[in-house]
A protein has these predicted regions:
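Primarily recognizes the serine-hydrolase "nucleophile elbow" in alpha/beta-hydrolase
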Residues: 104-167
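Short beta-to-alpha linker loops that shape the active-site pocket of alpha/beta-hydrolase fold enzymes
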Residues: 50, 79-89, 151, 248-249, ...
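Active-site glycine-rich loops that stabilize anionic/oxyanionic intermediates
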Residues: 41, 48-53
Length: 270
């Protein structure tokens, strides 16, 4: 699967390439945004949240990718197992599997001539930031890390409600069916729950030498905004910083007409 779409007007040099990356168990659908007029572009890996997909809610990652290209930065966004265009069974989704998929995407970027392998950053949204943090334990060359509404607690953290309500079902069936108001039911494997319980992403934050930007909304009811401050407090880079967006929820109001903070968040990110 290699489809290329021209998204610029400058001689057709700004491109979005739909690709499939092999992780040896299934393929990872991805969109690689880059500009052919540049050599060795800095690149950002975009990690979506639980039950979401590579474009993210309200097409946040689509808009971010476009804005990044405008300033000469490539990006890659992709679907975890069973999400978006992924053909893998949804029960294949596990937290450690997401970390491995992200590492596979990083390794793919390092094979691309257009990518400056010494200037790859990563951005995670919600649980995608937790994936990012866990990855930082093993992929130290990442130059910078950005958390959007990140949930990077060690262990269960903000997923306690799901553990209380659905873990027994996962024990009995091998997976739990979790109702979602904005999509069909989410199927999460027992392994997903066990991985969340047993992993320590904040340790990745503590070990990571690069700068971290943590952005959160002050009206986030899923991941309280003070956790963004905890992320930065655990960073050892003095350039790390936290930005709290006023009057903003977990998804930066992107689905609320006339109240979206998405553009503000993207500008802060850039």
């Amino acid at each position: 699967m290699k489809k290329i779409r021209t998204i610029g007007i400058d001689g057709g040099v700004d491109m979005e390439k739909s690709i499939a990356i092999d992780n040896k168990e299934y393929t990872i659908p991805a969109i690689f945004s880059y500009s052919e007029k540049n050599e060795k572009m800095p690149t950002v890996i975009l990690c979506h949240g639980t039950g979401s997909q590579k474009n993210e809610v309200g097409n946040l990652f689509v808009e971010l990718s476009r804005k990044l290209l405008n300033i000469g930065i490539a990006s890659i966004r992709f679907d975890y197992a069973g999400c978006g265009d992924s053909k893998a069974d949804q029960t294949k989704l596990s937290f450690c599997g997401e970390v491995n998929d992200t590492k596979t995407v990083y390794q793919y970027l390092c094979t691309q001539e257009i990518v400056d392998c010494n200037n790859i950053g990563i951005l995670g949204f919600s649980q995608g930031a937790r994936v990012m943090a866990e990855l930082l334990k093993d992929v130290s060359p990442i130059r910078f890390a950005i958390s959007w509404s990140g949930a990077c607690h060690n262990g269960i953290g903000v997923f306690k409600g799901w553990f209380d309500e659905y873990y027994q079902e996962a024990l009995e069936n091998g997976y739990a069916k979790i109702p979602m108001f904005w999509r069909e039911d989410l199927l999460l494997s027992k392994k997903w729950f066990d991985d969340i319980r047993d992993t320590t992403p904040m340790v990745g934050i503590q070990r990571y030498a690069g700068p971290i930007l943590a952005i959160a909304g002050d009206e986030d009811e899923l991941v309280p905004y003070h956790h963004a401050k905890e992320i930065v407090e655990n960073s050892k880079n003095n350039k790390s910083k936290v930005v709290i967006v006023p009057n903003s929820n977990h998804t930066f109001n992107v689905l609320i007409p006339n109240a979206s903070k998405a553009n503000d968040v993207i500008e802060i990110t850039l």
